[in-house]
Amino acid sequence: MDNFFRGGTLGIVFTEGELWQHQRRFALSVLRNFGMGRNLMEQKILDEIVAFTETLSKDANETSCDLPWRFEVCVGSIINAMLFGYRFEGEKLNEFKFFKSLLSDHMHSMVNPCIAILAQELDLLKYVFRGSYKLLDRNRKLFFDFFNRQIEEHEKELDLNSSDEPTDFVEAYLREIYLAEKNGGGNETYFTKKQLANMCLDLWFAGMETSANTLEFTVLYLIRNPKVMKKVHEELDRVIGTSRLITLKDKCNLPYLQATINESQRMANLLPLNLLHKTTRDVTILGHFIPKNTCIVPQIGNVLFNETIFPEPEMFKPERFLNENGELKKIEEFCPFSIGKRQCLGESLAKMELFLILANLFNQFEIFPKDPKHLPTLRRVPGITWQPTHYNVKIEKRHV
């Protein structure tokens, strides 16, 4: 499948060994340089949130607001600016709408177990599921045309003699390719334009789907649990009290909101099947011998819905993440970003996005179901990640 879709085992999600180590180390370094966990990245997210809330203000008091779409544009612009240096606005919105639709088609097609299995045997897929094969092939070409076009445009403008810091991921990677080719030592095999295109694929896919879906699930859960929504608003009114922009400095003073986000991540359990791993040595678990190099799938959902760890796991209860003093408490088993050396590369970015977007959304707006007599369903749309069934809402400004 990798040979068909990627042109080899490339990118960061499905690679291993030295190639994976080099890519992860480089990506983490770039994210740190971009200010991940510091106010540089925070400011970029806040700039996008200002545009997001200004758009929502125009939707206020209308009969219907497509909030999930607003989330997708906001998150998509953050990811795109980090990767390619521009946000989605004006005519670029049509570009985003096209590729987001393409991404959804791809995510949903790959959840079909027959297609997922036959994708490993492309000759069978090509002739047994011709339509699915053509869809995958079309998606592959369109995505890589887009990523390669971004790389080519960056190459035209790249000044390798400039001492300025790179402004986006593609620029940083192209500089690394140049240095690897210049210095030799074997690194030139790890940093190539083909590998860069696949890194863009992994980061764009992962950054888009997970954060946007979590935001959509959070609003869905709160619409269906108005008492939780009321407590979130009460905390925001007590701590913030105005429509000012909420920043990361406010985070420690908003434990109930943080607990609500944690509970949303737990309930959403975005990955129905986690990424494949393999054992690096022989191991025995609960009496079962598993030899080295066995493919395994760690199921985080089994932990997130474990009744011993999370009593009444089907209930939406943010209080489970608070201690008796109302302070946020750490639950070791809560691991929505996975654990270990292959845990989510963008965890810091995702946490920052979720808090800043939701804090400012709930502080500035009241959110209601479009039809109070028919609440949005909890039925999920299957895919590589779970997605809520699309819903619209009504919103009102909280501070006039």
Residue ranges and their predicted role:
Residues D145, E152-E153, L245-G287, E307, ...:
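Conserved cytochrome P450 K-helix E-x-x-R motif and the immediately C-terminal K′/meander segment
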Residues M1-F4, E18-L19, R38-L215, K231, ...:
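Cytochrome P450 heme-thiolate monooxygenase catalytic core
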Residues P226-V228, S348-I384:
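Cytochrome P450 heme-binding "Cys pocket" and the immediately downstream C-terminal segment
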Residues A172-R175, T294-C295, E366, P382-V400:
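C-terminal helix/juxtamembrane-tail motif
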Residues V232, S264, I290-N293, F316, ...:
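Hydrophobic, well-ordered secondary-structure elements that form the walls
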